[in-house]
UniProtKB/Swiss-Prot annotation:
Protein name from the UniProt record: Small ribosomal subunit protein uS7c
Family annotation (PANTHER family): RIBOSOMAL PROTEIN S7
A GO molecular-function descriptor: structural constituent of ribosome
Family: Belongs to the universal ribosomal protein uS7 family.
Subunit structure: Part of the 30S ribosomal subunit.
Matches recorded under SUPFAM superfamilies: Ribosomal protein S7 (SSF47973)
Keyword Chloroplast: yes
UniProt lineage: Eukaryota, Viridiplantae, Streptophyta, Embryophyta, Tracheophyta
Gene source species: Cedrus deodara
GO CC aspect terms: chloroplast; small ribosomal subunit
Gene that encodes the chain: rps7
CDD domains (alphabetical): uS7_Chloroplast
Length: 155
């Protein structure tokens, strides 16, 4: 048995311009090869793009998009007696938020377009409206969980 205590959860720091933790979480997921300044540049340009297109507060659009994409349940593979079942599991809000950010960025990377800030801004606006590939991913996950509700007792 390990004698180490469980590590404390680290809270996300806020970003330098908007002083928002959610913005920093998105920047840390955009990050590739340690180029944080590039990740900040991509997100800030996307935010500026959203502001010009929608004429709304871009942070509220970001919050709305993440809220719409955040899943309530997910499926986990569970081996029981030689066969694998996809068991539906409820997820906490923090984990749901992380999944939502990951899905939004994955959908915007796959999107056709000029550059990442253009693709990200359009994916965020679509998700805030209730359509887009990230929303489709959430609905697909929920459908999978509803289809496998019979295996919920394997949790």
């Amino acid at each position: 048995m390990s004698r180490r205590s469980t590590a404390e959860k680290k809270t996300a720091k806020s970003d330098p311009i908007y002083h928002n933790r959610l913005v920093n979480m998105v920047v840390n997921r955009i990050l590739k090869n340690g180029k944080k300044s590039l990740a900040y540049r991509i997100l800030y340009r996307a935010i500026k793009n959203i502001q010009q297109k929608t004429e709304k507060n871009p942070l509220s659009v970001l919050r709305q998009a993440i809220r719409r994409v955040t899943p309530n349940v997910t499926v986990k593979a569970r081996r029981v007696g030689g066969s694998t079942y996809r068991v539906p599991v409820e997820i906490r809000s923090t984990q749901g938020k992380v999944l939502a950010i990951r899905w939004l960025l994955g959908a915007s990377r796959k999107r056709p377009g000029r550059n990442m800030d253009f693709k990200l801004s359009h994916e965020l606006m679509d998700a805030a409206r209730g359509n887009g590939n990230a929303i489709r991913k959430k609905e697909e996950t929920h459908r999978m969980a509803x289809a496998n509700x019979a295996f919920a007792h394997f949790r």
